[in-house]
Amino acid sequence: MPKRKVAASRGGREEVPKRRSARLSAKPVPDKAEPKAKALAAKDKSENKKAQSKGKKGPKGKQTEETNQEQIKDNLPAENGETKSEETPASDAAVEKEEVKSE
């Protein structure tokens, strides 16, 4: 049979040892989540730099020719004598309201 501990035989309760010394307890406990957050932020920055460098480069070869042709087509007047209007024509109701306001 195992022997009993001396403190248990006295009827008293043992003191639980402190996990941290008084010197260490004066300092706040560091969070473990912070280093991970900084590491993720560093990855995001590197991805942003890659995206910026890719964005600065223009299309090459045939892609450039195609985009130039599309821009030229957009700038040309419409076929069959039709004209493109930037402004939409006013509706009848809107015209009537303007007439009433001007009176």
Curated annotation (Swiss-Prot):
Residues 51-60 have a biased composition (Basic residues). It holds the Pfam family HMG14_17. Residues 29-50, 94-103 have a biased composition (Basic and acidic residues). GO terms for biological process: chromatin organization. Its main location: nucleus. GO terms for cellular component: chromatin; nucleus. The keyword Nucleus applies. Keywords: DNA-binding, Nucleus. It is found in: Nucleus. PROSITE patterns: HMG14_17 (PS00355). GO terms for molecular function: chromatin binding; nucleosomal DNA binding. It comes from the Eukaryota. Residues 1-103 are annotated as: Disordered. Binds to the inner side of the nucleosomal DNA thus altering the interaction between the DNA and the histone octamer. May be involved in the process which maintains transcribable genes in a unique chromatin conformation. Belongs to the HMGN family. There are two HMG-14 proteins in chicken: HMG-14A the major component, and HMG-14B the minor component. This is Non-histone chromosomal protein HMG-14B.
